Amino acid sequence: GARLASWMPDLRGDSRPVQPTPRALLAALHRDVVGPIAVAGRVPLDAVAAPRPAGTAPVEGGPGPAPDGEALTARLEGLTRLIGLSGAPALVRAAAVHGEMVTVRPFLVGNAAVGRLLVRHLITRDGLEPTGVAVPDQYAARMPAAYADAAAAYASGTHDGVVAWVVWQAEAILVGIQEAQAVCRTVLAGTTAAG
C-alpha cells in the first residue's frame, strides 16, 4: 500500500515515524487495497475502509463461515488490540493478525490482501525484518493451496492448527526475504532493465 512506506522506519537512523492507531491502520490499508475497485464501481464506496455491517456476509470466501453481529464486533476488537499490543513476539503477532483477517473477514472484500499488507507492516515495525524490503505475500501467490490449507488450520482454533499457521507464516516471511535478497543482488549487479 502507498501509505505503508510512510510508516516504515528510517534505515539510516533511529527515527521512527508516528504509527497510526490500529483502527486507522486497518482503514488506511483497506482504502489502499479496495479504493481503486470501488472507484471502478465493483464495490460500494461505503464499503471502503469500513467494517462490514451486521447481517452482511463478506464477498470473498475463507476458511469457514465468517462471524457476524456481536461475534464480528468482538473479533474485530481483539484484532485491533493485537495490532497495538506492546511486547508481543513479532512473528506470532504478524501470523495471528493475518490469520484473523483471513478468518474473520471484517471487511466486505480485500481481507486477505489487507492481512498480507499487515504482515509486512508489523514485521517491519516490530523489527523482525526492519528494512521493509521483504515481500512475504509472494509465498501465498506461489502456493495458494498451501495458503488455503494453513488458513483452514488456523480457523480450526486448535493448538496444532494455530501452530501450523504460524509455521506457514514464518515460511512466507523467509521466502519474502529470499525474494528481496534476489532483487537486491540484481540491482547491485546492474542487471535490471527498464520497460
Language-model-derived ranges and their functions:
Residues G1-G195:
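FIC/Doc superfamily catalytic core
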